[in-house]
Amino acid sequence: MAVTKTHPIKSTLKAAIDYICNPEKTDGKLLVSSYGCAAETADIEFSWTRRHAIDKGTNLGRHLIQAFQPGEVTPEQAHEIGMELAKEILGGKYEFVLTTHIDKDHVHNHLIFNAVSFADHKHYHSNKRSYHDIRRTSDRLCKEHGLSVIIPGQDKGKSYIEHQAMQNGTSSVSYTHLRAHETL
């Protein structure tokens, strides 16, 4: 199961790339990949592409996070899925840096990509449709790799605290579910 979220990078591209490439989080940079640029100079290369853009937009790049359920995926498998996701959603038209972080209890990918295509110099349009395409693609790739997928609406109506308690098995609802299954 992977959860995805995305946000724009408006002014701190180099800092964001430096953060995701941190060797302490990426197994000594073994879990760092890039496309169309070098991770070490990606901010400069993104800027060069942006200078040639027809429609620059206001964003320097986009930051996508893909987080996996604890214990469900190896760092290498997560990185492979992240690379497949990046290539599919960006269609080989945008420079990107992909890293896999292993510093938390869950493995997660960070993908920073240029807001301008090096192929046609057009601006990436982020909206609900593009986000849902990212999520659908991520879910499909997770299924193809034998991972679980979040069922839409599964957690609808639960507060954050109830969701966390369910995850930890400490909520009254999870206790009731457990007792019901034990009696069957």
Segments predicted by a language model, with ranges:
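N-terminal nicking endonuclease/strand-transfer module with a His-rich metal-binding environment
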Residues: 1-179
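A short, hydrophobic C-terminal helix/tail in secreted or cell-surface proteins
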Residues: 180-184
